[in-house]
C-alpha cells in the first residue's frame, strides 16, 4: 500500500472490521493474488495507470506511485472467471441461484439471524440493466446457519445519496447521474439495520466527477465515466492546457 494511501485511509474509532479487512486484503494483494487470478485466465492491460494520485505532486492523500490496473475485457473480463467458477459450483450442487427473488426481511429466531424472507417477482426478459417488472407472483423463505448480506451500494438511489451526503461537503449536487442501474438502491441496508445490524460510515461515499450523460441510456439517469489514459494532456475550449491540479482522472 502506498505511503499516502496509508495516510488517506483515516480509520475511525469504530472501524475495527474495516481495518481488519484492509490488512487482510493488503496481505493477499502482496502475496498470492496475482498468481491466483492469472491461473483463472485473468489478464491486465500492460500499462499501469496513476489514478487518485493525491494532487499533482503526489504528496497529498492518494497514491504516491502508479498502481491502477485495467483488466483485459474491463468489467466482463474480471467477472468471467468468477462466473465460470460459480456455474461449476452450481453443477455439483454447492451453489443455488435464486433469480427474481426480492428479500424483504431477515428472519430472526431467539436473537439470531437464520434466514431471509421476501417476494418472488414475475419473470422478465428485459435488457440487462433496464428497470424490470416489480410484480409479485409469490413469496419465499430461505434458512441457513449463516447469513451474509452483500447487496451493493446506494448509487442508483439519489434520494439516499443526498440523505447520507457528508455535512462537511455542504449541499449535495442538484443534478446527478448514475453509473449503476436503478436496482442498486441501498434497500437492503435499511432492512439489515432493522434486523439489528450496526451501520458505520454512512457518510463515506465515493462518487466520481468525470462523468457524462449516456447519449443512449439503459437505466434512469445513466452516466458514463470518462477513463483517460495515463498522464494524458487536457485542454480547455480555447486550446489552452489545463493548469495543475485540474487533471481529470488523476486525483478523484
Indicate where each model-derived feature is located:
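Polyanionic/metal-chelating signatures
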Residues: 1, 34, 239
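Conserved redox-cofactor binding core of oxidoreductases
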Residues: 22-140, 144, 158-161, 212-213
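Hydrophobic alpha-helical scaffolding
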Residues: 23, 68-73, 175-182, 221, ...
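Fold-independent oxyanion-binding glycine-rich loops
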Residues: 100-102, 119-121, 144-146, 150-153, ...
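Glycine-rich loop(s) and the adjacent beta-strand/alpha-helix scaffold that form part
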Residues: 123-216
Amino acid at each position: 500500500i502506498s505511503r499516502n494511501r496509508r495516510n488517506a485511509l483515516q480509520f475511525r474509532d469504530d472501524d475495527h472490521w474495516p481495518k481488519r479487512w484492509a490488512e487482510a486484503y493488503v496481505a493477499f494483494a502482496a502475496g498470492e493474488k496475482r498468481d491466483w487470478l492469472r491461473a483463472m485466465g485473468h489478464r491486465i492491460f500492460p500499462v499501469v495507470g496513476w489514478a487518485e494520485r493525491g494532487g499533482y505532486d503526489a504528496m497529498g492523500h492518494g497514491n504516491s506511485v502508479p498502481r491502477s490496473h485495467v483488466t483485459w475485457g474491463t468489467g466482463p473480463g474480471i467477472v468471467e472467471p468468477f462466473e465460470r467458477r460459480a456455474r461449476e459450483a452450481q453443477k455439483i450442487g454447492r451453489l443455488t441461484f435464486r433469480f427474481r427473488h426480492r428479500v424483504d426481511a431477515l428472519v430472526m429466531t431467539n436473537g439470531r439471524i437464520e434466514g431471509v424472507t421476501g417476494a418472488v417477482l414475475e419473470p422478465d426478459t428485459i435488457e440487462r440493466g433496464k428497470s424490470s417488472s416489480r410484480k409479485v407472483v409469490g413469496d419465499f423463505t430461505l434458512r441457513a446457519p449463516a447469513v451474509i448480506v452483500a447487496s451493493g451500494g446506494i448509487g442508483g438511489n439519489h434520494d439516499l445519496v443526498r440523505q447520507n451526503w457528508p455535512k462537511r461537503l455542504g449541499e449535495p449536487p442538484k443534478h446527478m447521474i448514475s453509473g449503476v442501474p436503478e436496482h442498486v438502491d441501498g434497500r437492503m441496508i435499511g432492512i439489515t439495520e432493522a434486523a439489528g445490524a450496526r451501520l458505520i460510515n454512512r457518510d463515506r461515499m465515493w462518487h466520481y466527477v468525470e462523468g457524462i450523460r449516456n447519449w443512449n441510456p439503459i437505466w434512469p439517469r445513466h452516466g458514463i465515466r470518462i477513463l483517460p489514459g495515463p498522464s494524458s494532456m487536457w485542454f480547455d475550449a480555447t486550446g489552452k492546457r489545463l493548469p495543475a491540479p485540474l487533471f481529470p482522472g488523476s486525483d478523484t
